[in-house]
């Protein structure tokens, strides 16, 4: 921070100032102005059938295209988790009718700007800063949601207006939401510009019948066209009015699950100009601050001469924090946060740190190599259409020595079932994981060359390993 006082953010002067010297964590809320000016505090998952327009809706609201990778653009599908932040504003002129008084903009927009609607006066003022988690297909979505790699507060369920409802995946998404215990849902009837009014009304009745008796019963159904940005302000209004501000824990020791990591150095960079690795993730609890000493577990994993797993946690320091393009002095739960560290960049390149947990030194949970879980299996495989042969889609019981894929936090690792009885199972993990008793994990099995979600479990206890520490 050249030329300025330390502890005061200099980037984006048009946003609210953050000062570490005066920060009182106990007074922060998910609506504190100095927080939502720069970062999102509410996470909303977008759920829906493939090609029903999830990414387009996110783009219409936030102006951010969540499809970032070349192979995703070519196939027009989302493969990695996409995050996009949006600020939602409300006009402070009471004469302006709803829903026109709501507006959404990208996360670097100033917190107040004058109205441009003819016949109204006053300013648009920031009321919410939300983060959309645009999940690839439902299997990954369910695993992501289940193991809590991101705290989800609400969901947008997308249904395309030009197809009949429900599509096979849609019922799974509802199952996913039920498993997740997500209470707040908005149903968006998209592509309304492609159908006649009678068709839209007919589908509206189909949707009503479909959600009856599920968690989504009573959820508002909003007709929109994401491409034409039609009715997007209604979605903004409902996000403000229908999704309550979630309770957040700002006072605990901070903990972040890494879902992305990268080396930001360009090839041929001078040694003196090298920057440390960057880890990205969603903070589950606590507040991370610039200058804070951090620990990353399990850290560097290796095997000793006897083939036993060893872990060496990485210790480092936070040099920068950012949310999309906004610099932060401190970061609170919600949204995707980038953490610039002094970690060797080669350890971070190309998502190498995914699955690790970052937090305050000495406050992170144990590292497990074996887990004992109480598990719950789904009755049938999701998303497998079975005609005739009904047996194929039934989920078979866990068998001893089979290899499952286990999702814990953001880590996907293999796990061999070493013992199983009734609803308890023991799993030996291929990679060690930093987690704690009581955490939820997702279980997937290989079915016809694909990993399919077959159930979830909760950690009862397990075998932990002591991290090794350098003597120097």
Swiss-Prot record:
Region (G3): 134-137
G5: region residues: 225-227
A GO CC term assigned to this protein in UniProt: eukaryotic translation initiation factor 2 complex
One Pfam family from the record: GTP_EFTU_D2
Phosphoserine, modified sites: 16
Chief place of localization: cytoplasm
Subcellular location(s) of the protein: Cytoplasm, Cytosol
Domain tr-type G positions: 39-248
UniProt-annotated stretches for the region Interacts with CDC123: 457-469
Spans annotated as G4: 190-193
Region (G2): 76-80
SUPFAM superfamilies in the record: EF-Tu/eEF-1alpha/eIF2-gamma C-terminal domain (SSF50465), P-loop containing nucleoside triphosphate hydrolases (SSF52540), Translation proteins (SSF50447)
Residues that bind GTP: 51-56, 190-193, 225-227
N-acetylalanine modified-residue sites: 2
Disulphide bridges: none
Alphabetically ordered keywords of this record: Acetylation, Cytoplasm, GTP-binding, Hydrolase, Initiation factor, Nucleotide-binding, Phosphoprotein, Protein biosynthesis
InterPro entries, per database record: EFTu-like_2, eIF2G, eIF2g_C, eIF2g_dom_2, eIF2g_GTP-bd, P-loop_NTPase, T_Tr_GTP-bd_dom, Transl_B-barrel_sf
GO BP field: cytoplasmic translational initiation
E.C. designation(s): 3.6.5.3
Family of the protein in this entry: Belongs to the TRAFAC class translation factor GTPase superfamily. Classic translation factor GTPase family. EIF2G subfamily.
Assembly: Eukaryotic translation initiation factor 2 eIF2 is a heterotrimeric complex composed of an alpha (EIF2S1), a beta (EIF2S2) and a gamma (EIF2S3) chain. eIF2 is member of the 43S pre-initiation complex (43S PIC). Interacts (via C-terminus) with CDC123; the interaction is direct.
Record NCBIfam families: PRK04000.1
Cited function: Member of the eIF2 complex that functions in the early steps of protein synthesis by forming a ternary complex with GTP and initiator tRNA. This complex binds to a 40S ribosomal subunit, followed by mRNA binding to form the 43S pre-initiation complex (43S PIC). Junction of the 60S ribosomal subunit to form the 80S initiation complex is preceded by hydrolysis of the GTP bound to eIF2 and release of an eIF2-GDP binary complex. In order for eIF2 to recycle and catalyze another round of initiation, the GDP bound to eIF2 must exchange with GTP by way of a reaction catalyzed by eIF-2B.
Protein name: Eukaryotic translation initiation factor 2 subunit 3
Organism: Sus scrofa (Pig)
Gene that encodes it: EIF2S3
């Amino acid at each position: 921070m050249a030329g300025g006082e330390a502890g005061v953010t200099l980037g984006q002067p048009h946003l609210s100032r953050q000062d570490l010297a005066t920060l009182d964590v106990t007074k922060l809320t998910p609506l504190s102005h100095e927080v939502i000016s720069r970062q999102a505090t509410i996470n909303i998952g977008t759920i829906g059938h493939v090609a029903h327009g999830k990414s387009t809706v996110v783009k219409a609201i936030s102006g951010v295209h969540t499809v970032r990778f070349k192979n995703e653009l070519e196939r027009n599908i989302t493969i990695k988790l996409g995050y996009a932040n949006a600020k939602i504003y409300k006009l402070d002129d009471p004469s302006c009718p709803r829903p026109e008084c709501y507006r959404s903009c990208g996360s670097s927009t100033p917190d107040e700007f004058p109205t441009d609607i003819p016949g109204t006066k006053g300013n648009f003022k920031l009321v919410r800063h939300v983060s959309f988690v645009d999940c690839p297909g439902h299997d990954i979505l369910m695993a992501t949601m289940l193991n809590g790699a991101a705290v989800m507060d609400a969901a947008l369920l997308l249904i395309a207006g030009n197809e009949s409802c429900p599509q096979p995946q849609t019922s799974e998404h509802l199952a996913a939401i039920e498993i997740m215990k997500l209470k707040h849902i908005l149903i968006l009837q998209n592509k309304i510009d492609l159908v006649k009014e009678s068709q839209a009304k007919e589908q509206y009745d189909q949707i009503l019948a479909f959600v009856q008796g599920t968690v989504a019963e009573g959820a508002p159904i909003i007709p929109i066209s994401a491409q034409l940005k039609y009715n997007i302000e209604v979605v903004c209004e409902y996000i403000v009015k229908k999704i309550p501000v979630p309770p957040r824990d700002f006072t605990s020791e901070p903990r972040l699950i890494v879902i992305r990591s990268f080396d930001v150095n360009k090839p041929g960079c001078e040694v003196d100009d090298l920057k440390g690795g960057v880890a990205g993730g969603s903070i589950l609890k606590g507040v991370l601050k610039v200058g804070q000493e951090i620990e990353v577990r399990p850290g560097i994993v290796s095997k000793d001469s006897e083939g036993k797993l060893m872990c060496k946690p990485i210790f480092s320091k936070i040099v920068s924090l950012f949310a999309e393009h906004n610099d932060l002095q401190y970061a609170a739960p919600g949204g995707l946060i980038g953490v610039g560290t002094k970690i060797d960049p080669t350890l971070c390149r190309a998502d190498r740190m995914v699955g690790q947990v970052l937090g305050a030194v000495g406050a992170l949970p144990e590292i497990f190599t074996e887990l004992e879980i109480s598990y719950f299996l789904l009755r049938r495989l999701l998303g497998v259409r079975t005609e005739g042969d009904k047996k194929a889609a039934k989920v078979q019981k866990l068998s001893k020595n089979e290899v499952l894929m286990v999702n814990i936090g953001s880590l996907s690792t293999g796990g061999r079932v070493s013992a199983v009885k009734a609803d308890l199972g023991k799993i030996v993990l291929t990679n060690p994981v930093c987690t704690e008793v009581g955490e939820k994990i997702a279980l997937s099995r290989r079915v016809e060359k694909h990993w399919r979600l077959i159930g979830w479990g909760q950690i009862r206890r397990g075998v932990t390993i002591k991290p090794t520490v350098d003597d120097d």
